[in-house]
Regions:
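Conduit-forming functional cores of very large proteins
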Residues: 1-231
Length: 231
């Protein structure tokens, strides 16, 4: 869920057959200018624990001494097992590096492999960056690490939107600005909703708010579009 909203120019009309029912058409020019763009933050957290009496170690794994390494990119990790801030994150990057000693191999000089990889792989298909790293110890004395990532998200087909009144819909298509309808004054809408969505959802007050908003905008006045109250 991304709670992000703004005032938009809305056209209530059927257009191209791609905004049937609750489908919404968006103006690509408006999206390119930043409409409904949002920065999404996500936190990855990992807490160390003891395995067979040995505490896990946060570091960049050495492939010559570590078994079980993932088919992933370890190159962005620093010596603390995290990726430096403001670094681009890509799919299959190791976001948290961690190893644990292999107890039976620790004192055996004939064994080259001394550790087992416990690193975490990051999965993403969007442009994502490391925003903040935080490492500390919990009440039991174990180390924990938090990595906050940030992604700038632009609305795409299939995203769901709702008006303040609760009229919901999903993006059915995104048209270039030149393909959007235009008024005699040269005004193009940011979004187009289908008029059939209002009676089917029984959101008549949505239409009331829309008409009242247009009137008070032209008159420069304040209005009350509340649907319920004292009569």
């Amino acid at each position: 869920k991304i709670p992000s909203g703004t005032n938009v120019i809305v056209a209530i009309m059927t257009y191209s057959g791609l905004n049937q029912e609750d489908s919404i058409l968006f103006n690509k020019g408006s999206l390119d200018r930043g409409l409904f763009g949002a920065t999404v933050y996500h936190t990855e957290k990992d807490e160390d624990k003891k395995i067979h009496g040995d505490e896990e170690i946060r570091c960049k794994a050495d492939k010559t001494k570590t078994k079980g390494m993932k088919f992933a990119n370890y190159n962005k990790l620093n010596e603390h097992g995290v990726i430096p801030e403001n670094t681009l994150l890509e799919n299959n990057d190791i976001i948290l590096g961690k190893i644990v000693p292999i107890k039976e191999n620790r004192n055996d000089h004939t064994k080259i492999i001394k550790y087992k990889d416990m690193s975490r792989v990051y999965r993403t298909h969007e442009e994502c960056y490391v925003d903040k790293n935080y490492m500390n110890r919990n009440g039991e004395g174990y180390t924990f690490a938090k990595v906050r990532t940030r992604t700038y998200r632009v609305p795409t087909i299939g995203d769901k939107f709702s008006s303040r009144h609760g009229q919901k819909g999903t993006i059915g298509n995104i048209f270039s600005e030149s393909d959007m309808p235009v008024t005699g004054d040269g005004l193009r809408p940011d979004i187009i909703i289908n008029p059939h969505a209002i009676p089917s959802r029984m959101t008549i007050a949505q239409l009331k708010e829309t008409l009242l908003g247009k009137v008070i905008l032209d008159l420069g006045l304040f209005g009350d579009g509340t649907s319920f109250g004292a009569f």
